[in-house]
Amino acid sequence: MEQQKEITKGGFTLPGEAGFEKLTLELANRWGADVIRDSDGTELSDDILNAGYGIYSTICLIRDHNAWAKANIDKLQQTFLVTSPVVANSETLTIDLMEGFFKEQFLVNDSEEALEYWQVYDRTTETLLQKESWSYHPQNQTVVLTGICPWHKYTVSFMAYRIWEEISMYNHTTNNWNKEHLMQIDPIHKETQEYLLTWMDDWCKKHEQTTVVRFTSMFYNFVWMWGSNEKNRYLFSDWASYDFTVSPHALKLFEEEYGYVLTAEDFIHQGKFHVTHMPADKHKLDWMEFINNFVVDFGKKLIDIVHNYGKLAYVFYDDSWVGVEPYHKNFEKFGFDGLIKCVFSGFEVRLCAGVKVNTHELRLHPYLFPVGLGGAPTFMEGGNPTLDAKNYWISVRRALLREPIDRIGLGGYLHLVEDFPDFTDYIEKIANEFRRIKELHNAGKPMALKPRIAVLHSWGSLRSWTLSGHFHETYMHDLIHINESLSGLPFDVKFINFEDINQGALEEVDVVINAGIMGSAWTGGQAWEDQEIIERLTRFVYEGKAFIGVNEPSALTGYDTLYRMAHVLGVDMDLGDRVSHGRYSFTEEPVEELEFAECGPKAKRNIYLTDGLAKVLKEENGIPVMTSYEFGRGRGIYLASYEHSIKNARTLLNIILYAAGESFHQEGITNNVYTECAYYEKDKILVMINNSNTLQESSVTIKGRTYTKDIPAFDTVILPLE
């Protein structure tokens, strides 16, 4: 890596481990750590604590309190569960509540206050059965239905305690731990709050050497329901779901504040639950607001205690983060000093960087565990953690060039690296590389190209950059691929919702992207009923801007076209009611810079040209998969799908430039699709990166002068320009 100076200290958090003091301090020196942390399952010895480093101590507020939890079972966290539909073959039916659920995670709550919220539904007619039609039998945890309709389907929605904290449960089963299962307590109860305030104060007294308290995270985990059948172990998982925040007491408090009663069905939603990928209704939004207000109000009291002891408070933007909402206006009320995000991908870097907090820190992958999240070997025989680290780093690095991050680090069991010296060498390299990139941002933002981008969906800025979880959890959605590509492209990007459009958000952007399937939160669903949205977007494009639609953009049934923006896109999708209508023929007119080298758009059946004027840039089996439509002075672009790759990121860049009427060949863009660059104008520093596993020659023009470099595999070149 070419550079003016080497920065070898600071901005790095190392996971220490008692019993491996020599290794801990040796790697702290090599990796330039200024902070040492503990991890789930590890401790720091006095030798480490007294070695002169800052100390991060990890706390999970709602677990590690088993003695108190066992004495206060009614204060455990809960959730609504729903049985699988069962078909009745007579007028009576017995349903086993826990069939299919992981019994080490859930325990039926059949208390009087919980039973008040249980519901039994006829799913054939979607009608609620009166309580006189069913009875609960606690001895075998079954519900017996009587006087029902044979051959109809029935479900029971009930409340259950969660008796094994999910993150600990995952770590326990992954690492073959042999220790007590940790329960999770619910601070919605006054008694729990009093206990936690006292515990937090005592904890701070006992941890004098801790400089930063790392909250993991606040109170409520993302939903992660496990099943008893290993063929379908994870029944339901949604990183941004609020399902694990419910309890009879919380529901009563909600009723008092909002003036109406929430039911089990408000959460169960026909067994579909309210996944983040679908637009939220008013009841869900009210519940989210209620929980967010509580988490902020009580969370601040705990953070104030930490501050009173002269310590900093950081929050981990994963695990039990639900209700924290770092992109909500309430977040700054917490008083957090920093935020830590676990990252696999570039979009997660941008997710972290955009939060209003003093310190932004990334927890890099791979974690120092024997196996990775997918169960593949990592720090064990058959694993290649160095290659894993390189592949993760090239995704992270391209986003790091666009927005500043203050710190990076690792987590897990440090002793596992002893058998992988090439891994320790590589971490030393990227730690130094990170520090240099961090320094470049101090002088100002890198150069950005002209089109300003707005990604339009139902959640808007609240879900900036993310959908619901990591890339491998949301890969089936076009938008996460778009976000990942955008994370390292030289554009200013913002995320807006439909109300933002009515408030004038289009005045600040040049290109709007809407991507996803019909009815999803990512395309907007019923939001497209608002004629003012249509009017504003139509005028926006007509007056010279661009609308890029991917998959089923603006789709909503009930109108003359399925795509509400079909008049701007020049294409629409037929659901069958136009099967007898004629279709315009066309000739493919490819544009070299817009061709996909790999993983191109996949054809969707029944896409047709609305008036025959759209230019078909790419077709597949006679179906348009990428089109361009001139509308007034602007342009609509349609893509049947989008999949992120290094090459495709360049194609997306070109599509955006083309949509905005900008040149493909301009300064600040490398000539090699495997490479990218960032130019920091104030310091006149050019950074060129190689996103491939082979040597690449790359050229880029800055201020009229072209610079050409050979960049080794995975590597970075930093050039001071005269």
Curated annotation (Swiss-Prot):
InterPro entries in the record: Class_I_gatase-like, Ig-like_fold, Lact_bio_phlase-like_N, Lacto-N-biose_phosphorylase, LBP_C, LBP_M
EC numbers, comma separated: 2.4.1.247
Domain of life: Bacteria
Catalytic residues as annotated in Swiss-Prot or TrEMBL: 319
GO BP annotation list: rhamnose metabolic process
Reactions mediated catalytically: beta-D-galactosyl-(1->4)-L-rhamnose + phosphate = alpha-D-galactose 1-phosphate + L-rhamnopyranose
Lineage of origin: Bacteria, Bacillati, Bacillota, Clostridia, Lachnospirales
The entry's keywords: Carbohydrate metabolism, Glycosyltransferase, Rhamnose metabolism, Transferase
UniProt entry tagged with the keyword Nucleus: no
Pfam families: Lact_bio_phlase, LBP_C, LBP_M
Name of the protein: D-galactosyl-beta-1->4-L-rhamnose phosphorylase
UniProt keyword annotation of tRNA-binding present: no
Class of this enzyme: transferase
Record SUPFAM superfamilies: Class I glutamine amidotransferase-like
Family: Belongs to the glycoside hydrolase 112 family.
Described function: Reversibly phosphorolyzes beta-D-galactosyl-(1->4)-L-rhamnose to form alpha-D-galactose 1-phosphate and L-rhamnose. Does not phosphorolyze galacto-N-biose or lacto-N-biose. In the reverse reaction, has the highest activity toward L-rhamnose, also has activity toward L-mannose, and low activity toward L-lyxose, D-glucose, 2-deoxy-D-glucose and D-galactose.
GO molecular function annotation: 1,4-alpha-oligoglucan phosphorylase activity
